[in-house]
Amino acid sequence: SGADLQNANMHRAVFKNCTLTKTNLSGADLSYANLNGNKLDKAVLNNAVLYRTGLRGADLNYASFAYAKLQEATLDKANAQNADFSYAGMSYSWLYKTDLTSAVLTHANLYNAKMQNAVLTNADLTSANLSRSNLQHAQLNGARLDRAMLDDADLSYADLTLTDFGRAFKDNAKF
């Protein structure tokens, strides 16, 4: 934990029962890696490449993924409270039952993301692209979605209590 692995090439690496808390993985290539169930709390993964990376059930609380590439990554059931995903590319990613309470997802690209039952309580999704995303049964209470793109998104049965849609784009969105 706390190691400096900036720009490391860990393509297809498999991590088992690892504690990577506070590890600096900025710019690292973790595409196709298996990080399922590992501890990455407070890790820094800014500008990292995590294409199709497995993060299922991982602890990502307070981790930073700013500008990271997480396309088609699997974050199902991950704990990512207070994590920073600002400007992250997360299109086609899997976030089923992921806990993103108070996470920052400003300007994140979540196009066609699978986010059923995700917890986004008090999350900041300002200017995020959620077009065609599936947010069925998601908890968005207190979330901020000002200027977010929700075109063709499915928010059926989502908890939208005190959700701030501001100037969100909602063409053909399902509520």
Please give the residue ranges for each predicted region.
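Tandem repeat scaffolds
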Residues: 1-175
